[in-house]
């Protein structure tokens, strides 16, 4: 009840006179993933009904589940590594966003939604959170979230525990770091209907040129996904160097490892046309 009491007190605070301040809340949890395994002391509707200050951004926290560290405490919230590529697992982030969208629309119509804390699993992340296996979830979360709402996802954390984008102590980039870097480099901010099922997402190009940038997540570990391009495109194919739980990711077959002084590796794509095969368990960006 502590969170609820704090939020109720804050609800009566006067609005800031600083025009640069963004009012946001309520920092909710639930709707899918870890939230479904945690009882609600105060509901999101209860919190929002108390606010007297108009807010600019609707916020919530989201994790896909509970890590191995907390499995014994909250077994219903834990996913096994064997499930981390499944449609059910990958669907959780989008389900959460869509469960909050009607609440946002009721109390803050037109506002963005910000996920102010997110990761693969609460409790430090799963042991595979630092490997290529979690890239499928990370990229699919970005793609699916963008089809549900305009907003921002804040990842927890940069360099701590299993879900850190950087390895603690060495600061060496992990697979998710490169995946998100490529997302931000290639995928623009205008979202289109990809027109197909599965885990395929279509945006404008980040470079501002005419055309489209696609993200394709082939979460089938046995079958290849085949894509027909209308012309030439640029392919950025991602895979685990040594399998799904590899600590090193490859881009078009080349290892993504930072240099001794932190230099970025070559992140260039390769030119493709006609039929493009997306290997089992791999992810790909295609810019056309």
Regions found by a protein language model. Name each.
Residues 68-69, 243-248, 286:
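Short, solvent-exposed loop/turn elements at domain surfaces
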Residues 1-135, 148:
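Noncatalytic carbohydrate-binding groove/subsite architecture in carbohydrate-active enzymes
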Residues 112-205:
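Aromatic/acidic polysaccharide-binding cleft in carbohydrate-active enzymes
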Residues 59, 115, 154, 213-216:
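Structured core elements
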Residues 229-278:
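Acidic, Ser/Thr/Pro-rich beta/coil linker or hinge segments at domain junctions
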Residues 198-243, 280-287:
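Carbohydrate-binding surface patches
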Residues 68, 163, 224:
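Glycine/Thr-rich phosphate-binding loops of Rossmann-like dinucleotide-binding domains
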Residues 47-50, 98-106, 110-113, 121-133, ...:
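Mature, folded catalytic cores of secreted/periplasmic enzymes
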């Amino acid at each position: 009840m502590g969170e609820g009491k704090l939020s109720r007190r804050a609800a009566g605070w006067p609005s800031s006179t600083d025009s640069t301040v963004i009012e946001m809340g309520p920092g909710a949890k639930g709707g899918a993933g870890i939230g479904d395994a945690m009882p609600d002391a105060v509901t999101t509707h209860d919190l929002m009904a108390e606010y007297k200050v108009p807010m600019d951004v609707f916020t919530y926290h989201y994790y896909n589940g509970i890590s191995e560290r907390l499995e014994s405490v909250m077994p219903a919230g834990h996913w096994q590594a064997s499930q981390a590529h499944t449609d059910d697992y990958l669907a959780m982030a989008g389900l959460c966003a869509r469960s909050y969208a009607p609440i946002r629309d009721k109390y803050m119509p037109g506002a963005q939604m910000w996920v102010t804390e997110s990761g693969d699993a609460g409790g430090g992340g799963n042991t595979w959170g630092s490997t290529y296996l979690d890239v499928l979830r990370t990229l699919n979360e970005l793609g699916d979230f963008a089809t549900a709402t305009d907003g921002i996802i804040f990842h927890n954390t940069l360099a701590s525990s299993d879900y850190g984008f950087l390895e603690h102590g060495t600061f060496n980039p992990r697979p998710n770091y490169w995946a998100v870097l490529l997302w931000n480099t290639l995928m623009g901010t205008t979202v289109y209907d990809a027109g197909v099922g599965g885990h395929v997402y279509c945006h404008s190009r980040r470079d501002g040129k005419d055309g489209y940038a696609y993200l394709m997540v082939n979460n089938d570990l046995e079958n290849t996904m085949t894509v027909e391009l209308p012309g030439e495109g640029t392919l950025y194919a991602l895979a685990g160097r040594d399998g799904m739980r590899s600590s090193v990711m490859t881009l078009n077959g080349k290892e993504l490892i930072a240099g001794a002084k932190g230099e970025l590796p070559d992140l260039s794509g390769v030119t493709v046309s006609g039929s493009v095969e997306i290997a089992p368990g791999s992810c790909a960006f295609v810019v056309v």
